[in-house]
């Protein structure tokens, strides 16, 4: 658990590692970084130990924006701010350990002291976020939840699986279907997008690939945009938040999640991927 990980990382109990109640009482900038469901559960304890002038710091706007579902409503005599790194917690940590940062958005929800913005930006620098862009709690959570459900995760898995299944149904081997769907994307094409943009990736592919991609991209946009709009509306209405809270608050949540992830792991597409990853030059 997180307590054991903290001990392994060198934190010392009763010196700089405390239970939530004690940490909230001692702190002046309280970084509230539990899971969304965990924040709901711990909020009465944290709220009771906030002091006038404290700063309540979030990395995600979920608890504040969907307060009708979370009951997280901070007192008026504290600053409420957000720094949302554009990556997973694991990425933030590994980049920090390597002396690198990760882009982040920041927002001030409540400025009791008159210094909330300065405190927010200073804390962002402290975690290694050198490039910041300002947003609001609402915009952060609405874009974040939409991105996770669509292009960043949900749509990505769905699109990968759809193409893989089409290729397999037309007689292509698992290896070929995986390579043409995922391996080439991750190893060759996506790094080019990251390096200099989509046009750079197009420019470094064959003319046949360029023509096909340019012709088909608008068709996918027109097909997918209504689905993404539907997702966005469900996010801003709070429907997706309610689903997440109800699911993640169940006593068997972890067991059910493990089952769902195991089902993904055992899909033929990803089984083929395990074999192919082992054949990458760096793994031989």
Feature locations, PLM:
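NAD(P)-dependent Rossmann-like dehydrogenase/reductase catalytic/cofactor-binding core
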Residues: 169-284
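A ubiquitous short alpha-helical element
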Residues: 144-151, 211-217
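Rossmann-like NAD(P)-binding element
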Residues: 7-65, 73-88
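C-terminal catalytic lobe of FAD-dependent flavoproteins
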Residues: 151-161
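Small-residue helix-packing motif on alpha-helices
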Residues: 3, 23, 174-178
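Amphipathic alpha-helical segments within well-ordered protein domains
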Residues: 161-168
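Rossmann-fold dinucleotide-binding core
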Residues: 57-149
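Anionic-ligand anchoring segments at beta-strand to alpha-helix junctions in alpha/beta enzyme folds, i.e.
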Residues: 1-7
């Amino acid at each position: 658990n997180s307590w054991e990980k903290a001990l392994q990382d060198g934190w010392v109990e009763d010196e700089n590692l405390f239970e939530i109640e004690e940490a909230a009482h001692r702190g002046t900038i309280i970084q509230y970084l539990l899971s969304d469901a965990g924040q709901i559960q711990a909020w009465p304890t944290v709220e009771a130990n906030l002091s006038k002038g404290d700063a309540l710091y979030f990395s995600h706007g979920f608890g504040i924006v969907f307060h009708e579902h979370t009951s997280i409503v901070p007192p008026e005599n504290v600053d409420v701010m957000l720094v949302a790194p554009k990556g997973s917690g694991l990425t933030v940590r590994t980049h920090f350990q390597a002396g690198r940062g990760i882009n982040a958005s920041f927002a001030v929800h409540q400025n009791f002291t008159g210094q909330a913005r300065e405190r927010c930006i200073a804390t962002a620098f402290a975690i290694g976020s050198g490039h910041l862009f300002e947003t609001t709690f609402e915009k952060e959570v609405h874009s974040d939840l939409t991105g996770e459900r669509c292009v960043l995760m949900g749509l990505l898995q769905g699109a990968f699986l759809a193409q893989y299944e089409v290729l397999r149904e037309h007689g292509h081997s698992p290896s070929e279907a995986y390579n043409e769907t995922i391996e080439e994307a991750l190893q060759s094409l996506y790094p080019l997008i990251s390096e200099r943009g989509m046009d750079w990736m197009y420019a470094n592919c064959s003319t046949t690939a360029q023509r096909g991609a340019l012709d088909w991209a608008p068709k996918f946009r027109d097909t997918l945009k209504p689905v993404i709009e539907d997702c966005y509306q469900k996010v801003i209405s709070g429907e997706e938040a309610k689903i997440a809270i109800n699911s993640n608050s169940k006593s068997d949540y972890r067991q059910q999640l493990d089952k769902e992830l195991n089902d993904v792991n055992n899909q033929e597409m990803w089984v083929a991927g395990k074999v192919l990853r082992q054949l990458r030059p760096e793994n031989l």
